[in-house]
Amino acid sequence: TIADRQAEQAMRDILTERLPEHAILGEESGMSGTNGDWLWVLDPIDGTRAFLTGRPTFGTLISLFHKGRPVLGLIDQPVTGERWIGVSERPTQFLSDRLPGTIGTRPCPNAAEAELSCTAPEIMTAAHAPRFANLQKHTRRTSWGGDCYAYGLLALGQIDVIAECTMNPWDWGALVPVVEGAGGRITDWQGQSLTLESDGTVLACGDATLLPELVRHLS
């Protein structure tokens, strides 16, 4: 959309002016710069369908990668005034003037008790759909349509598990520090850390001890 392109360009202009030595990767305009160590990854409107239909589950995602791994992430929901800020190896911050919330994932040691979330069933490819369906069978129930906002809710202890595929670095980069700084884990479906070379699958859980069981159900 025009809003996507204009928002990304505004962010690019600020970063280029203040940090000209850093590279930038955005959903709308691709890669600029060649610095191999520091890379800003931008998604001005994650959840375009939600944005276009007036549902406040979209958000702006900004992340900073260092040597291929995300070390800083921001999820911003401008309608509700909520913002999550994650920095590697530090507690996630939640900022909100209107809505209450305390950062911290909740215990959920068994998949059978877990609330599962995914943006939409149609994001599943033919190869991934049966694996996701198997995970569904082993969880309590599934909710749809959260986009990046679901990961913020996981960091607040409202959701237990999120499993998605066909994700790009601008979709998940900001989510990693936010989820991990709240006490959760976020990996690919094999349980491996997410990098720029990852396969597009994303698995997040609030209770880190649940990860091996989830990976088994998705295998």
Question: Where in the sequence are the language-model features?
Answer:
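N-terminal subdomain of lithium-sensitive/metallo-dependent phosphomonoesterases centered on the IMPase/IPPase/PAP
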Residues: T1-I45
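Residues at secondary-structure transition points
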Residues: I2, Q6, L52-R55, G145
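Residue-level signal for inorganic ion chemistry
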Residues: D4, L15, T48, Q77, ...
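Generic detector of well-ordered alpha-helical packing
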Residues: R5, E28, P44-G47, P78, ...
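DPxDG-like acidic metal-binding loop motif
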Residues: T34-Q93
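Short loop segments at secondary-structure junctions
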Residues: F65-R69, V79, S88-P91, D97-R98, ...
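An extended, acidic
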Residues: G104-S219
